[in-house]
Amino acid sequence: MENQLAKSTEERTFQYQDSLPSLPVPSLEESLKKYLESVKPFANQEEYKKTEEIVQKFQSGIGEKLHQKLLERAKGKRNWLEEWWLNVAYLDVRIPSQLNVNFAGPAAHFEHYWPPKEGTQLERGSITLWHNLNYWQLLRKEKVPVHKVGNTPLDMNQFRMLFSTCKVPGITRDSIMNYFRTESEGRSPNHIVVLCRGRAFVFDVIHEGCLVTPPELLRQLTYIHKKCHSEPDGPGIAALTSEERTRWAKAREYLIGLDPENLALLEKIQSSLLVYSMEDSSPHVTPEDYSEIIAAILIGDPTVRWGDKSYNLISFSNGVFGCNCDHAPFDAMIMVNISYYVDEKIFQNEGRWKGSEKVRDIPLPEELIFIVDEKVLNDINQAKAQYLREASDLQIAAYAFTSFGKKLTKNKMLHPDTFIQLALQLAYYRLHGHPGCCYETAMTRHFYHGRTETMRSCTVEAVRWCQSMQDPSVNLRERQQKMLQAFAKHNKMMKDCSAGKGFDRHLLGLLLIAKEEGLPVPELFTDPLFSKSGGGGNFVLSTSLVGYLRVQGVVVPMVHNGYGFFYHIRDDRFVVACSAWKSCPETDAEKLVQLTFCAFHDMIQLMNSTHL
């Protein structure tokens, strides 16, 4: 990253935005062909035949008309999906988003210079905060390197949403407020908000034209910490952000109606660079076991994180850190980038601040004191109760598999991401006795404002291989051949999805055109196989590769009887974070992770046994 930053004077972060290609609309015939292929693992012959007829009827009838209208829409937009996706996937969703939509993850500093240690929260916090603020300055100066695949630049628009961004609840649809500006565009907010024990404080991070230093940040954080630990807790307004969206919107309107000053305070939080959260707990963490820390970050104290904020930087009493982010403005890879940057800086400086200890005479933090009444306090208590009830139902299993990693799989000519995806398919098959429809995130940032496409990893080839692994009459050579066929299929599909040739977003576009035109929902979308194969947000496995760095993440399952499964890949290990709902008797995150680890061994054994 440092080398990249050195080169970055030649290129500006956002300089290629105008030259990126528009998001293409795939061919209707190709999309429907791929869709039919994806439902096969979940259908018997009769069901498949019925779906095939529905698809043929759709293709020659209403589907073609909708497709033509979609092509018309695409002519006038560089990204025909962007606004739709934001609304349908995020802003129209009414369930509580802090737990159900946000993503979270631990900072990797505990693996090197910052193992858990009581009494380090404030000093370490000042250092990690300073490195985050440096990244903010690089972004304002457009010195964050442009992401590329080979020499092809990727869309960088999501980086605009990292700082000074917040979702605002609406009665039927939320909105996103983004206050960030690059230096060439003008002024940008330069304050952060700190939440501690139900209270909120604000201070500027620029003093007399210069960024505050870690010793100065330490003074500010110490002031807040002492004040909150020697005085009564605050009302915990932040807990309202964990509520069901329409209820939060109404509670917010009431809060603003109570006193106009409350709106000014809310806007201070919305426009802040980030929210820095001070937790009192000390979650256990080791480089092999992430379960407790990940749970603490994802489902910690609702009064000290602002669920709608694009970036909550969370600190714990034992000096470990993490982030909790609203998913609407950006995808996890943006957070991975800043997390890796900060971790590298902490590593390079051996976890210490090596600069001046001088503290300038900077103004003390100012407390944001909301005007509240009985109704607001009651709303807060109701939000907390709802959040804690749902959060207590979540099971998290997050561990490192350390027998081998990317180095060995590459050596065996196996793509490491596909390796994990197929191991997960086998684990699910062994645990549940049938295939699991699976969503893997594919990246479409080759295109203007591109975000993601759905890659359906539960292929016919993957299922045939899983069946062969459970059938004692199938020999090793045949099992290996079936596995390699599953690898080839997966790799091709991932390539297609990243090139704008996936089908899930295309089908969504056709459905939304029908809705906008006031037409009945086409039979393709009401066919039981559509949802049984994962369509309409019904994937039992919701998965994503977090990358190849020391950064891990987690999300909750997409459906009640499903799993969230995030993982990252290193030379010597695979780290997996799996979530499930305890109230679902069918699912068990611990078992699924352990069976996935067993599958890793089985797959490598398969390659070893056949001397390839």
Curated annotation (Swiss-Prot):
The record's Gene3D superfamilies line, in alphabetical order, gives: Chloramphenicol acetyltransferase-like domain (3.30.559.10), Choline/Carnitine o-acyltransferase (1.10.275.20), Choline/Carnitine o-acyltransferase, domain 2 (3.30.559.70)
Positions with a binding annotation for CoA? K406, K410, N411, K412, M413, L414, H415, P416, D417
InterPro entries membership: Carn_acyl_trans, Carn_acyl_trans_N, CAT-like_dom_sf, Cho/carn_acyl_trans, Cho/carn_acyl_trans_2
Q: Which pathway features in its UniProt record? A: Lipid metabolism; fatty acid beta-oxidation
What are the entry keywords?
Answer: Acetylation, Acyltransferase, Fatty acid metabolism, Lipid metabolism, Peroxisome, Transferase, Transport
Q: Name one GO molecular function term.
A: carnitine O-octanoyltransferase activity
Which positions are annotated as binding (R)-carnitine?
Y439, T441, T452
- Family of this protein: Belongs to the carnitine/choline acetyltransferase family.
* Protein known as: Peroxisomal carnitine O-octanoyltransferase
Task: Tell me which species this is from.
Answer: Homo sapiens (Human)
